[in-house]
Amino acid sequence: MSGAAAASAAGYDRHITIFSPEGRLYQVEYAFKATNQTNINSLAVRGKDCTVVISQKKVPDKLLDPTTVSYIFCISRTIGMVVNGPIPDARNAALRAKAEAAEFRYKYGYDMPCDVLAKRMANLSQIYTQRAYMRPLGVILTFVSVDEELGPSIYKTDPAGYYVGYKATATGPKQQEITTNLENHFKKSKIDHINEESWEKVVEFAITHMIDALGTEFSKNDLEVGVATKDKFFTLSAENIEERLVAIAEQD
């Protein structure tokens, strides 16, 4: 980049509302970089009657209570969310998503559908790219549920305000490796979900593919797992995760 171009970029990256001559919003690009700041990878897959999300869990200080560090949030009775990005922004996004879901239920008398919540959060993220007194949140949000009409569902939103549904998805620094692993599986299976009856088997599938893609082993304290069924969203305890890891080891 020439000196003039560098000066131009330096000027435009002070404004989140102004495009550079190259058509870029630098502050939004920086927000995308922030999503990998925590070096956490997550993965979401659909089963026959459930949706499973798993995330790495890294506790930065040995004196921290590990139960207070989480990237998976229960948004409503049926919707869960995993966040990639700084914890403060993650908690802010989770609080707003919970408020939106609660307001929807109060107003209309039924639970907010997963796709509607994802669209709403994406719209809010897009607004943050237009206002000078706001900044984009440096988080990518992945919502999971089992919808009454759509069945097992996964939706993802990003700092630019884009949202889309997925058959399976990965987020984080090793996103490409995990995605390639998943694509290879679905190419062979020729169906768009994990053809297992129980959520336990889908959890084992997700953990196995995370292990294969990252080339590392996990203990029960290295992972978080959330499961969405038709009736509820819940997270697994460390003991439940240990059971699934033992089952995976026995299969090998």
UniProtKB/Swiss-Prot annotation:
The keyword ATP-binding does not apply. It holds the Pfam family Proteasome_A_N. Keywords: Acetylation, Cytoplasm, Isopeptide bond, Nucleus, Phosphoprotein, Proteasome, Ubl conjugation. There is a cross-link at residue 232 (Glycyl lysine isopeptide (Lys-Gly) (interchain with G-Cter in ubiquitin)). Gene3D superfamilies: Glutamine Phosphoribosylpyrophosphate, subunit 1, domain 1. Belongs to the peptidase T1A family. This is Proteasome subunit alpha type-1. The gene is SCL1.
